[in-house]
Structure formats: structure tokens, C-alpha cells
Amino acid sequence: MLLLPPRPPHPRSSSPEVMDPPPPKTPPFPKAEGPSSTSSSVAGPRPPRLGRHLLIDANGVPYTYTVQLEEEPRGPPQREATPGEPGPRKGYSCPECARVFASPLRLQSHRVSHSDLKPFTCGACGKAFKRSSHLSRHRATHRARAGPPHTCPLCPRRFQDAAELAQHVRLH
């Protein structure tokens, strides 16, 4: 909240509208001189931001009050994230390795990589995996060794897909 100093009592004038004259309009930055006047280089620091407020004193006389505004930091204030809670930029950080994830579900699935649990077991060889997708990829190695499961009854050809075998049989 901006607190303004009290205006000294103003004697009642004949004109009900007593205001400070508006400031002259000037460009915010000095223009570059010389042949490259269209260049985008800016000389010197940025001028201070001014806030002008139209106020009315206790006698009903309007006046303007100008204050210099402080530069506000851009964006929300940054702070360090504690493990498992939303981080300063992206989301949820892992307490083990400090990786940051957008959702708590992604963090939860990532934390499996730090544990020793391997709940997905291959039925053919007994090898265990942390993720079901890794088990599915492993099962393909067993299928590749055995060969395609669908064999043509008329010739020695084999197919991965039953629809491919059916099309092949029609060609015989």
C-alpha cells in the first residue's frame, strides 16, 4: 500500500480545478545521432519509472502527486524446493537424485528406479524387471529365438501374424 504525505491546507481559490500542469512529453530514450539513426542501441541507463496520482484534498481541490516507483522483480519469487514438493520452476523433485518432474505421478514412477523392487517376472526364464515395458521388450527375445508362431500347413513358411498366414494360405 502506498502511503502519501498529507497535502498542506490549500486556500480556497476562485477556480474549483487547481491542478499541476502536465509534464512535457519527451521521448523515453535519447535518439541516436549520425547515419545509423535507426539502430536499436540505447545509450545510458533506463529512466526511473514515475507514478502520477490524481488526488483530492480535504477541501475538494484536485492535485497530482508524483512518486518514483521501485523496479519490481519479474516473475514470482524463487525459492529452493524441498524433496517431494513442487520446485521453483518445473514441479516435483526427487529426494534421491534431485531430478524435477512435472507431476507427482511421474516422480512416483521415477522413484522405482532407485528401489530394489522388481515386481515384473518373465514366465519363460524367471528374470525380473522394475518396469512392465522392460519385461515386454524382454519377452520379444524369447519369441525371436523360437521363430514366428504361425506355420503354414502347406509349406515350411512361418509368420508372426495370423492374418499374414491366412493371406498366404489363400495364395496356395
Swiss-Prot record:
Residues 19-30 have a biased composition (Pro residues). There is a cross-link at K31, K118 (Glycyl lysine isopeptide (Lys-Gly) (interchain with G-Cter in SUMO2)). It is found in: Nucleus. It holds the Pfam family zf-C2H2. Keywords: Chemotaxis, DNA-binding, Inflammatory response, Isopeptide bond, Metal-binding, Nucleus, Repeat, Transcription, Transcription regulation, Ubl conjugation, Zinc, Zinc-finger. InterPro entries: Znf_C2H2_sf, Znf_C2H2_type. This is Zinc finger protein 580. It comes from Mus musculus (Mouse). The lineage of its organism: Eukaryota, Metazoa, Chordata, Craniata, Vertebrata. The gene is Znf580.
